[in-house]
Amino acid sequence: NALLTKDTFSLFNAQRHLIEPLEPEVGMSAIGRSLYGKALKDAFKPLLSPENDNEMAAINSLQVLSLVGNEQSCGILINHADTSTEQRASLRLWASAGLGKTFKTGVLQTQRIIPKAELLADFASREPKWYVVARMFDSLTSLQHVPGLNDIQQSELEELSLQLQTRAL
C-alpha cells in the first residue's frame, strides 16, 4: 500500500524498502527469491491491474519485480510489455526496461532467457510507441551482458541479441 502514495519521498522510501532484500550483497537464495517474488506478485496484483489509475505505483511495482529476476517476475514483466495485454504505454515502457534488468541479474538460466527474449522481439515488432521500442531494444542488447555464463553461452546470447534486434526491425 505504501506504493500507492503520490508523495515522492514516501514512494522512494517504500521502493527502497522493497528493493533492499534483493541487493547482491544480501545474497538471497533462490528459494528466498522465489518466496519473496511470490509475495510481491500477490501484493502488486491490484497495483498492476488496469483498474488502478495510479500509474506511478504500477511502474514502481514493475521496477521492484525487475530486480527479483526469476521466472515468475519475468513472466509478469513480459505480460506488461505486450500491447495485447497492456494498454498503458508507460507500463509497457517500464516492463520492457525491467526485462533487461531481469536478464542481467544472472538468476535466470539461459534456456529461460531465450524464449522471453524472443517474445520481447516479437512485441517490439508490433509496438506503436518508439520510446517503448527503444527500451525493448535496450533489453535485447542486455543479453550481451548476462553475468555468470561460460564463453559458449555468452557467445550464443550475444548472437541471439543481434538476431532478435534485426528480426524486430
Annotate each predicted stretch with a short phrase.
Residues 5-9, 49-56, 82-90, 123-131, ...:
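Short coil turns that connect the paired helices of HEAT/ARM alpha-solenoid repeats
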Residues 8-35, 56-70, 89-108, 130-148:
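Structural detector for internal amphipathic alpha-helices that build alpha-solenoid repeat scaffolds
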Residues 1-2, 27-49, 70-82, 105-124, ...:
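Amphipathic alpha-helical scaffolding segments comprising HEAT/armadillo-like alpha-solenoid repeats
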